[in-house]
Curated annotation (Swiss-Prot):
Protein role: Catalyzes the reduction of aromatic alpha-keto acids in the presence of NADH. Plays essential roles in the malate-aspartate shuttle and the tricarboxylic acid cycle, important in mitochondrial NADH supply for oxidative phosphorylation. Catalyzes the reduction of 2-oxoglutarate to 2-hydroxyglutarate, leading to elevated reactive oxygen species (ROS).
Domain of life: Eukaryota
Record: residues binding substrate: 92, 98, 131, 162
Subunit structure comment from the entry: Homodimer.
PROSITE patterns in alphabetical order: MDH (PS00068)
Enzyme active site: 187
Signal peptide residues on this chain, from the entry's feature table: none
Predominant location: cytoplasm
GO CC annotations on file: cytosol
Any one GO biological process: tricarboxylic acid cycle
Species, as recorded: Xenopus laevis (African clawed frog)
Protein name: Malate dehydrogenase, cytoplasmic
Length: 334
């Protein structure tokens, strides 16, 4: 058996983690023969709840799970990690300005970035889920200068999966038959879900999404707004934010980092924008279409960007620049 992979999940007493931990522990992410050490971090008031989560993981009697470490201390949580999945963040409370939310989270992710820098392996893969995910990820990256920038990514796979599902529902096909949708930009309501490079398998043949759907107005209108606002729609209906679908997206995201993307397919992830060929400003965590091989991602090059797409891509880049400026003001005053 290979050496255990050491994986941290933060916000481990929360509802996303509750759906996520079982998937990781039973081998859905790192493979069915890869032993694991799970490290669960949460804030001190959540430690009793976390004990219950540990009991349940023990009671699952999972053969791959070699050890579970529950802690409220960063020096314990970040020690010698292979993978860090940063789910925990300050949630937006009613009446809270986005600026206040950014300020609270800059503090958290600055501290966690510094802990990654100090205690984790330099090869650690860091996945940020806690919102605002892109800017939280950039904050952690800036606070961990000894870890390569390329090791940081943030979750836009939930948006990617939502986009696939919407096209599949529209055409009454399996979501696996929809390939190469793209989420550009921020994991927020300015994101740009782009179907212009997507294909759909119909009767064994791959057809462009626009040709398959035969409804350009929907693909340039209702499809985009549905994906952009899906998180809010789930909260309105369920009175809680997406957890099961978020956990599934995290599993997809990390599994693709670990094992690579299938030939001819790309996925969406927020990564550092340095050196991109799509006119996105440098030094942002921006969601691009990527292929992954040997645990290394590459932005898909050469996709044609029409005026409609350009405008949408610029709007979300502008929001990310504004967020970054606000976050960095707080960072420098910390």
């Amino acid at each position: 058996m290979p050496e255990p992979v050491k994986v941290l999940v933060t916000g481990a007493a929360g509802q996303i983690a509750y759906s996520l931990l079982f998937g990781i522990a039973k081998g859905d992410v790192f493979g069915k023969d890869q032993p694991l050490i799970l490290v669960l971090l949460d804030i001190t008031p959540m430690m009793t709840v976390l004990e219950g989560v540990v009991m349940e993981l023990q009671d699952c009697a999972l053969p791959l799970l070699k050890e579970v470490i529950a802690t409220d201390k960063e020096d314990v949580a970040f020690k010698d990690l292979d993978v860090a999945i940063l789910v925990g963040s300050m949630p937006r409370r009613e009446g809270m300005e986005r600026k206040d939310l950014l300020k609270a989270n800059v503090k958290i992710f600055k501290s966690q970035g510094a802990a990654l820098n100090k205690y984790s392996k330099k090869s650690v893969k860091v996945i940020v889920v806690g919102n605002p995910a892109n800017t939280n990820c950039l904050t952690a990256l800036k606070s961990a200068p000894s870890i390569p920038k390329e090791n940081f990514s943030c979750l836009t796979r939930l948006d990617h999966n939502r986009a696939k599902a919407q096209i599949a529902l529209k055409l009454n096909v399996a979501s696996d038959d929809v390939k190469n949708v793209i989420i550009w930009g921020n994991h927020s309501s300015t994101q740009y879900p782009d179907a212009s490079h997507a294909s759909v398998t119909l009767q064994g043949k791959d057809v462009g999404a626009f040709e398959a759907v035969k409804n350009d107005d929907w693909l340039k209108g209702g499809f985009i707004t549905t994906v952009q606002q899906r998180g809010a729609a789930v909260i309105k209906a369920r009175k809680l934010s997406s957890a099961m679908s978020a956990a599934k997206a995290i599993c997809d995201h990390v599994r693709d980092i670990w094992f690579g993307t299938p030939e001819g397919q790309f996925v969406s992830m927020g990564v550092i924008s340095d050196g991109n060929s799509y006119g996105v400003p440098e030094d942002l965590m921006y969601s691009f279409p990527l292929t992954i091989k040997n645990k290394t991602w590459k932005i898909v090059e050469g996709l044609c960007i029409n005026d409609f797409s350009r405008e949408k891509m610029d709007i979300t880049a502008k929001e990310l620049q504004d967020e970054k400026e606000t976050a960095f003001e707080f960072l420098s005053s910390e």
